[in-house]
Structures are given as structure tokens and as C-alpha cells.
Curated annotation (Swiss-Prot):
A single GO BP: proteolysis
Species annotation: Deinococcus radiodurans (strain ATCC 13939 / DSM 20539 / JCM 16871 / CCUG 27074 / LMG 4051 / NBRC 15346 / NCIMB 9279 / VKM B-1422 / R1)
Keywords, comma-separated and alphabetical: Hydrolase, Protease, Serine protease
Lineage, top ranks: Bacteria, Thermotogati, Deinococcota, Deinococci, Deinococcales
Family under the similarity heading: Belongs to the peptidase S51 family.
InterPro entries, per the entry: Class_I_gatase-like, Peptidase_S51
EC number: 3.4.21.-
Name of the protein described by the UniProt record: Uncharacterized peptidase DR_1070
First-level EC class: hydrolase
Listed GO MF terms: serine-type peptidase activity
Active site, per annotation: S112, H153
Length: 199
């Protein structure tokens, strides 16, 4: 199993995928369609030579999700609202399809929310993202692809996520979950149980 979990992308993404075609899952940012970070995220992948196959889970049936994942070299789960993302994954059943394919060897790249959902829980980011955006989501269990609970943007340099919020997150959830604080520009490369921190 291979994961590249980023706070906001990383120069090693194309190397990690080892191919060209990537299923791009944008659902976490569906309420931010015109936000600059959304376009910047897509451009970051394209600049590394990756071809993006758009895969919006909220209006793609499971058979089409499966077909797309079978035709690409990797899957990229974009950033945005973590709780909304998990709600979409869970309500569509695509969480099970993606988890199965990644466990079978499909490379998984997460960015921010996409990295958080790969872990054991998304509860630990509830001070950063609002659970209220996903009122029907009652279970915060993540995809369970790693035991680490990623906390993105941990340098506190983004106004939306000041260092005080990061510190409160560690105080509130640090004893309950194995937190991994990532700054923008950092990534976790996880392969067959081995974890490497990339700067």
C-alpha cells in the first residue's frame, strides 16, 4: 500500500505516482468551486506532468468510480472541507471502493482534507474544519489507510488556521490520537508500512 499525504501538495507527486493518469477527486472543495486554492491545486499537479481525470464522487455512480480507478495510475483526493468530504465518501459508498483499490496497490495522494480522511479519524480536525457542514455525518472514522491522524497547515501561517488553533488541536486530541503535524511543503510517504517525512 502506497500513500503520499501532503499538507498542500509536494514536488514528489509525479515521482510517487510513477505514471501519468490520476483520478482527481474534488468533492472536499465543492463549496469553494471558484476559490483560488482550488485552481492552484489542479495546476500544481498539471505542472508535474500529470493528466487529471475528474472524478466528482457526489454525482458519479459506483460502477463509474470503479471503472475510472481501474483506468488510472493513482488517485488524488483534493483539499477543502474534511467533514463534507467524508460525508460524500460515506454516503456514496465510494469510501469502500477507494479503500479496497488502494489496499490492492493503487497509489493514493491526499492534500489537506484528502490526507486527513486517509487516517483513523477526522475528529482531530474539528477545531479547524466545522462538522456543521456535514450534519448527517455521525461517525468520524476515516478510511483507515494509516494509523496517523494528519493535522495539515501546522505552521500556523494560514490565517484560517492560526498557530493557536493548531496548539488547541494538539492539547485537545494529542493524547487520544497519534497526531502527525504537517506544514505546507511537507509530506508523508508511506509504503508497505514504512513512513518517511519529506520536506
Amino acid at each position: 500500500m502506497r500513500l503520499l499525504l501532503t499538507s498542500f501538495q509536494h514536488p514528489s507527486m509525479a515521482q510517487f505516482i510513477g505514471g501519468k493518469r490520476v483520478a482527481y477527486i474534488p468533492d472536499a472543495a465543492r463549496s469553494y468551486a471558484d476559490a483560488p486554492f482550488v485552481q492552484k491545486e489542479r495546476e500544481g499537479l498539471e505542472k508535474q506532468g500529470l493528466e487529471l481525470i475528474n472524478l466528482p464522487l457526489s454525482h458519479t455512480d459506483l460502477a463509474a468510480v470503479e471503472t475510472t480507478l481501474n483506468a488510472v495510475d493513482g488517485v488524488y483526493v483534493a483539499g477543502g472541507e474534511t467533514f463534507d468530504l467524508l460525508q460524500v465518501l460515506r454516503s456514496t459508498g465510494s469510501d469502500k471502493v477507494i479503500t479496497r483499490r488502494v489496499r490492492q496497490g493503487l497509489p493514493y495522494i491526499g492534500c489537506s482534507a484528502g490526507s486527513v480522511v486517509a487516517g483513523p479519524t477526522i475528529e482531530a480536525v474539528s477545531l479547524m474544519d466545522s462538522p456543521d457542514i456535514a450534519p448527517d455525518l455521525k461517525d468520524y472514522t476515516g478510511l483507515g489507510l494509516t494509523e496517523l491522524a494528519v493535522i495539515p497547515h501546522a505552521s500556523g501561517s494560514i490565517s484560517q488556521f492560526p498557530i493557536e488553533t493548531i496548539a488547541d488541536t494538539v492539547r485537545t486530541y494529542g493524547e487520544r490520537w497519534p497526531l502527525c503535524l504537517l506544514r505546507d511543503g511537507q509530506a508523508l510517504w508511506i509504503e508497505d508500512g514504512e513512513v518517511r517525512l519529506l520536506n
